[in-house]
Regions:
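ATP-dependent carboxylate-amine ligase
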Residues: 1-123
Length: 123
């Protein structure tokens, strides 16, 4: 159902929340997640706060010293992110085909419109 659920794939353990992402839920998920890998989609419908809120997420990840981060959505291009940014989930899917993740504990979260669940088959 894409709402916060834990799942084990053949290669990784995932926490999947591909239904809703707003600044509060994104920050809470990052703070409570005990894993090492983050795949985060854009937060949509933030209007004039889009840049600020996406930068806040990037800053949280940097402060946490996250091991591996992939960001999905053009909204992240406005930030000073040190992490790879993919404009679409399809772009990240292609990248992961050539750079598969193995034995990671992954938080997969993004707004419904980013369709983060499209990555499940490759994770």
């Amino acid at each position: 159902n894409n709402r916060s659920q834990s799942m084990q794939t053949a290669h990784n353990h995932l926490i999947v929340d591909a239904y809703n992402a707003n600044p509060t839920s994104m920050q809470a998920a990052i703070n409570s997640f005990k894993g090492d890998t983050f795949i985060l989609g854009a937060m949509r419908e933030l209007g004039e706060y889009t840049h600020l809120e996406h930068q806040n997420i990037v800053n949280m990840l940097a402060e946490r010293k996250a091991d591996l981060v992939y960001l999905v959505g053009e909204e992240y291009r406005l930030t000073t992110s040190p992490y790879p940014i993919f404009d679409t989930v399809e772009d990240l899917h292609v990248f992961l085909q050539d750079n598969p993740l193995q034995d990671h504990y992954i938080l997969l979260k993004g707004s419904r419109s980013t369709r983060m669940e499209k990555l499940l088959d490759i994770l």
